[in-house]
Curated annotation (Swiss-Prot):
Positions of Zn(2+) 2 binding: 57-58, 127, 165
Record's signal peptide: none
Gene for this chain: gloB
Names of the cofactor(s): Zn(2+)
Name under which the protein is recorded: Hydroxyacylglutathione hydrolase
Assigned protein family: Belongs to the metallo-beta-lactamase superfamily. Glyoxalase II family.
Protein's job: Thiolesterase that catalyzes the hydrolysis of S-D-lactoyl-glutathione to form glutathione and D-lactic acid.
Organism: Salmonella gallinarum (strain 287/91 / NCTC 13346)
Pathway(s) served: Secondary metabolite metabolism; methylglyoxal degradation; (R)-lactate from methylglyoxal: step 2/2
Pfam families per UniProt: HAGH_C, Lactamase_B
Self-association and partners: Monomer.
GO biological process: methylglyoxal catabolic process to D-lactate via S-lactoyl-glutathione
């Protein structure tokens, strides 16, 4: 399997997973034009689309792509039924695409129906987890998002986090505002800054490394707890997550 990315809009990535025969699955095509261009250039044969949630920048290109490739199956949660999904999927489902088994799990928070697709080592997590951050809570609660992140955090160390936006630099700046002396975060900041100066993408990221630099995955880390305790005493990791998310919302 080969992982490819197509830039879209200002900071989106549309992921395309291909096999050796050129058959492919397209993840969250927010617009069709760049996908059609890449398909023509690489002579890919689209077999399926994965949708993680219903937001327009993730589903906007589905109907046009289906006009060109009507044989495709479009997998998505119930909230994407009116956005082009032809096969509804949910928590615990498994599907076979490109000869590989993908496991679905619900990750409510950003939206209530958000799902992720996992076939080791690839995790297509939409707007649930970003490098250095997590999605805004447009529909769900902090508790729901925390539990969703813990599902991701339980995956193998070598999981490749294929999220949908290039938010890494801004997220790491936020992390440094909370833990300015953290060596891992500072090192990652230098690396990410250099990549972005060169207009290079910072994704995908390996979960093992993400656990070191993403504060939203470190809610039981003593350094972070001590920092939060300077402002407020929060006993539960979910409460510390909510505190972080609130801080990020106004950063």
């Amino acid at each position: 399997m080969n992982l490819n990315s197509i830039p879209a809009f200002q900071d989106n990535y549309i992921w395309v997973l291909t096999n050796d025969e050129g058959r492919c699955v397209i993840v969250d095509p927010g617009e069709a034009a760049p996908v059609l261009k890449a398909i023509a250039e690489h002579k890919w044969m689209p077999e399926a689309i994965f949708l993680t949630h219903h937001h327009h920048d993730h589903v906007g290109g589905v109907k046009e792509l289906l006009q060109h490739f009507p044989q495709m199956t479009v997998y998505g949660p119930a909230e994407t039924k009116d956005k082009g999904a032809t096969h509804l999927v949910g928590d615990g489902d498994t599907i076979r695409v490109l000869g590989e088994k993908f496991t679905l799990f619900a990750t409510p928070g950003h939206t209530l129906g958000h799902v992720c697709y996992f076939s080791h080592p690839y995790l297509f997590c939409g707007d649930t987890l970003f490098s250095g951050g997590c999605g805004r809570l447009f529909e769900g609660t902090p508790s729901q998002m925390y539990q969703s992140l813990m599902k991701i955090n339980s995956l193998p160390d070598d999981t490749l986090i294929c999220c949908a936006h290039e938010y890494t630099l801004a997220n790491i700046k936020f992390a440094l505002s909370i833990l300015p002396h953290d060596s891992f975060i500072n090192e990652y900041y230098r690396k990410v800054k250099e990549l972005r100066v060169k207009k290079q993408m910072t994704l995908p990221v390996i979960l093992k490394n993400e656990r070191k630099i993403n504060l939203f995955l470190r809610t039981e880390d003593i350094d972070l707890i001590n920092e939060i305790n300077k402002e407020t005493i929060l006993q539960q990791p979910e409460a510390r997550f909510a505190w972080l998310r609130s801080k990020k919302d106004t950063f």
